């Protein structure tokens, strides 16, 4: 059973905003360290950023998939398609994080790795916006004329 914060738009939105804000800040900090040529510290910051994605963003995705999405579909079976798309977004985020972990071991903080970190931000922002729209906004009822 999903916790109450997942079921309320304002609380769910706050979780999304907090998670994304933290990821943006940590990404910017890592990039600033690279600009200052603090490569060792930047690499540590990248490791912390990966951990942040796993423990904050992806753990939220896991919680959604472990009950919240099922509850939403049980309440409205028409949401099954939307939930499938949202779950796919989570899979994309997981894949990007896994790719970053492999690439960073092979190439360090290469431009490709930095692009992947930015891809996470974009996918997550779009996913959160779509999730809030698809699962929380009530459809406008058609007026009978």
Predicted regions and their residues:
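Small-residue-biased structural context
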Residues: 1-145
């Amino acid at each position: 059973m999903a916790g109450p914060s997942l079921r309320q738009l304002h609380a769910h939105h706050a979780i999304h905003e907090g998670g994304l804000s933290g990821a943006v800040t940590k990404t910017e900090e890592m990039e600033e360290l690279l600009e200052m040529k603090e490569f060792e510290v930047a690499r540590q910051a990248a490791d912390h950023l990966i951990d942040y994605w796993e423990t904050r963003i992806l753990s939220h995705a896991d919680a959604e998939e472990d009950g919240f999405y099922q509850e939403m579909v049980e309440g409205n079976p028409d949401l099954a398609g939307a939930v499938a798309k949202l779950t796919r977004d989570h899979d994309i985020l997981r894949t990007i994080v896994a790719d970053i972990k492999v690439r960073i071991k092979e190439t360090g903080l290469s431009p490709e790795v930095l692009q992947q970190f930015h891809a996470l931000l974009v996918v997550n922002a779009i996913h959160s916006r779509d999730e809030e729209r698809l699962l929380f906004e009530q459809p406008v009822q058609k007026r009978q004329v």
